[in-house]
A protein has these predicted regions:
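Accessory DNA-binding and partner-docking regions appended to nucleic-acid-acting proteins
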Residues: 1-76, 99, 446-449, 453-739
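Helicase motor core with emphasis on the C-terminal RecA-like subdomain
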Residues: 75-80, 91, 95-117, 124-128, ...
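K/E-rich alpha-helical interaction surfaces of small helical-bundle regulatory domains
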Residues: 87-88
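Intrinsically disordered, low-complexity domain-flanking/linker segments in eukaryotic proteins
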Residues: 130-141
Length: 739
């Protein structure tokens, strides 16, 4: 009944089975990067605010030597051949790399599989080679390239591949132990690393940001992967990406390269504005692939798709990826196909790591021909001979569609991309789009909770802590829009700033060496842990904030000691309950009037986001059903044209048939009064029309789940009706005005 909370794969952080705390914090501990004894500033500048001088266009000059464009490209080409075993650059790779080596910023918009990563990996390796020629820096003073990416598995894969090539690279992620993090810190200070990968959430860590001024040689380059996430016009906006641009400026990075596979003209404008990239620094490769046959069929009912799918698979052999929206869909369709004589496996984020790896390996080696998957499958998959990409239901955006069909036919051979269109599937997508907009009352109550009496009386620079999870449940606001709200308070209104998060819960199981170890250490911290760690059954628990305040100790020192004890086997440590921490930047809203004004501004922004999400779904439907060549529509969506400005690709459904794909008309339905009454009978809530409409339409929310209303017959009782009409009826019941 309805969509389970965990049945939809967003695709953002679905590649490692880490818990929510790890995803939010992206680190072993909040103090893992706070240095006890900072080293000397490696660049020798006593004033950290002195800007880094950019190289002039055309050459990098020093008193010891000069490096022209030809020499720089020779170095890059040698690295391409020696380290990566490629004979030549493809498309715009050479131009983008040349610009970076020249000291300028760049944006790379290449399709999936077109080699974006080389555009920062080669410069990272080239910097020491260039320094040898110019003699501007010592061998161990060539600095670091930092790569920011939300995709943990991809970061790990790239680091492993670089290490196999003998290139010094590391990844700071949630799987690292405290000791491993400290080793990375040491290597950074000593100039031993060429590349460091991290998630955007890492940039909230004050210790990490502070560490940058002690990096030997400084930050030569920052690579921003999935850069479209910075744009509010983009299809997968992530608030933490807005902080990447701020990070680049604050640490005085010499240059930046942004990379994405899918960027429309408005998204490109946003990226260029945020990272100071001029028009001549944008490098694009066409999304048009002449070997891909873009096809679509529209059906009246979902069950009509099965026969079409069987026929397609019979006539189109080879490796096949079928994309479904829900985890349950993927499982059921794979089982259905297997029963019908088309052996298939399913893949989604809810599976165990070993299960996912086995299926991925079998698909890569063609032991499995067909995989039915959610969006969680495909990132980083570089299988050249995928013959078919099938969309079992409508993708969420044109960008998502483009990215997924781009996984077919990378060997240049003819491949097929089929999309099945059915109105019954639209409900799922609308459900996701509608679910992120809270009620205005919920937003106002949240702001009053954030800016309570204790917080508004804090002085500038003082900090406060909140639990996003707790606020999400209490105010019926999903984590995603909650993150957007906090990002706006930080970056748009400049009221607060996120700092290093903290774990609220510390528990450990003591081993036989626990007491002897603490007695040998014999420090104020060890004595405090011995005194204040309370044992209940087999676990000890301790409130580090309370202990630090009571004993006059640094919380980070207590954390470090617990990590040491854990790494040395004296305890088995369990941490949890992430609390976000914010610093006050300006005068905070105290009065009801001030809160109301802030509520109005934020709510308008959230409403705009909902509208954009719904419009993206409409764009996908229009892409398929408009009287235009699919290839041309796709190219124009990204601000491009077909080769030779052609109006037809000649090999899509529209070009074959000479007419548009006709979607059967929707059957108009009046609001069901009995269903309205059914919802009102299921709950006594009468002050939140949007909450009641969510129940009727079948939209899960924290409050719906907490009250177990998704288990009642009222949930989804109006899923086949117009949401706006439903909302209007419940506003009458709650006597609310229109938003």
């Amino acid at each position: 009944m309805g969509i389970p909370d965990d049945d939809f794969d967003s695709g953002d952080a679905l590649f490692d089975d880490v818990d929510e705390d790890d995803l939010i914090f992206d680190g072993v501990e909040e103090s893992d990067l706070i240095e006890k004894t900072p080293g000397k500033h490696s660049r020798g500048k006593e004033n950290d605010n002195v800007p880094v001088k950019k190289a002039r266009h055309g050459s990098i000059s020093t008193t010891n030597g000069q490096l022209g464009e030809t020499q720089r490209l020779q170095i890059a080409q040698r690295i391409l051949a020696d380290n990566f075993r490629y004979k030549s650059f493809r498309h715009e790779q050479e131009a983008a790399i040349s610009r970076i080596l020249n000291g300028d910023n760049a944006l790379v918009v290449f399709p999936t599989g077109a080699g974006k990563s080389l555009c920062y990996q080669i410069p990272a390796i080239a910097f020491p080679e260039m320094d040898k020629v110019t003699k501007e820096r010592h061998a161990d003073d060539s600095g670091i390239t930092i790569v920011v990416s939300p995709l943990i598995a991809l970061m790990k894969d790239q680091v492993d591949a670089l290490k196999r090539k003998g290139i010094a690279a590391e990844c700071m992620d949630s799987t690292k132990t405290w000791e491993e993090i400290q080793k990375i810190n040491k290597d950074l200070r000593e100039g031993k690393l060429r590349l460091l990968y991290c998630a955007p959430e890492r940039l909230n860590n004050e210790g990490f940001v502070g560490m940058m001024k002690y990096v030997k040689g400084g930050v030569r380059l920052i690579g921003v992967d999935e850069a479209h996430c910075i744009s509010e016009w983009g299809h997968s906006f992530r608030p933490d990406y807005l902080k990447v641009a701020r990070f680049v400026k604050e640490i005085q990075a010499e240059r930046v390269i942004c990379l994405t596979a899918t960027a429309t003209p408005p998204v490109i404008d946003d990226i260029c504005k945020a990272f100071d990239i001029s028009n001549d620094g944008v490098f694009k490769t066409s999304v048009y692939r002449p070997n891909l046959r873009l096809e679509a069929e529209a059906v009246q009912a979902k069950d009509d798709k099965y026969g079409l799918l069987y026929e397609f698979l019979k006539t189109h052999p080879g490796s096949t990826l079928i994309y479904a929206t829900l985890q349950k869909q993927a499982e059921e369709l794979a089982q259905h196909l297997t029963r019908k004589g088309f052996p298939a496996a399913h893949f989604h984020a809810g599976m165990k790591i070993e299960e996912k790896k086995a299926i991925q390996d079998d698909f890569m080696t063609s032991k499995i021909q067909t995989v039915v998957a959610t969006i969680a499958f495909g990132m980083g998959i570089d299988k050249p001979d995928i013959r078919n990409i099938i969309h079992w239901d409508v993708p969420s955006t044109v960008e998502e569609y483009c990215q997924q069909v781009g996984r077919a036919g990378r060997d240049g051979k003819q491949s097929y991309c089929m999309l099945y269109l059915c109105r019954e599937d639209f409900w799922i997508r609308e459900n996701f789009a509608r679910g992120d907009l809270p009620s205005r009352n919920s937003l106002r109550d949240l702001l009053k909770d954030i800016f309570d009496d204790d917080v508004v009386n804090l002085r500038q620079g003082e900090t406060f802590k909140v639990s996003h999870y707790g606020q999400s449940t209490k105010f019926d606001i999903r984590i995603s829009p909650l993150s957007v709200i906090y990002a706006a308070l930080e970056l748009k209104f400049n009221l607060i700033r996120a700092t290093t998060p903290e774990y609220s819960s510390y528990k450990f199981e003591a081993t036989s060496s626990y007491f002897p170890r603490l007695k040998v250490i014999n420090t104020p911290e060890s004595k405090a842990i011995l005194q204040h760690a309370k044992k209940a059954k087999k676990f000890h628990s301790i409130d580090l904030t309370q202990v630090a305040n009571k004993e006059g100790l640094r919380r980070s020192d207590l954390v470090n000691l617990l990590n040491d004890l854990n790494n040395n086997g004296a305890i088995v440590l369990t941490v949890g309950g992430v609390e976000q921490k914010y610093k006050v930047l300006a005068k905070l809203p105290k009065t009801d009037t001030a809160i109301d004004k802030l509520t109005d501004k934020l709510y308008e922004d959230l409403k705009r986001r909902e509208k954009q999400a719904l419009e993206r779904l409409t764009e996908v439907v229009s892409f398929v059903t408009s009287p235009k060549c699919f290839g041309l529509s796709l190219a124009q969506h990204f601000g491009m044209d077909l080769p030779s400005n052609s109006k037809k690709c000649g090999h899509c459904t529209f070009c074959y048939q000479g007419q548009r794909v006709a979607l059967p008309p929707a059957s108009p339905k009046k609001v069901d009064r009995s269903a309205i009454n059914q919802v009102l009978a299921a709950t006594d809530v009468r002050d939140d029309a949007r909450f009641l409409a969510r129940i009727a339409f079948g939209i899960k929310s924290p409050r719906v789940g907490k009250l177990k209303l998704d288990k009642t017959k009222a949930f989804m009782c109006m899923a086949d009706q117009d949401f706006d009409a439903i909302l209007k009826e419940f506003k009458k019941v709650c006597k609310e005005k229109d938003d």
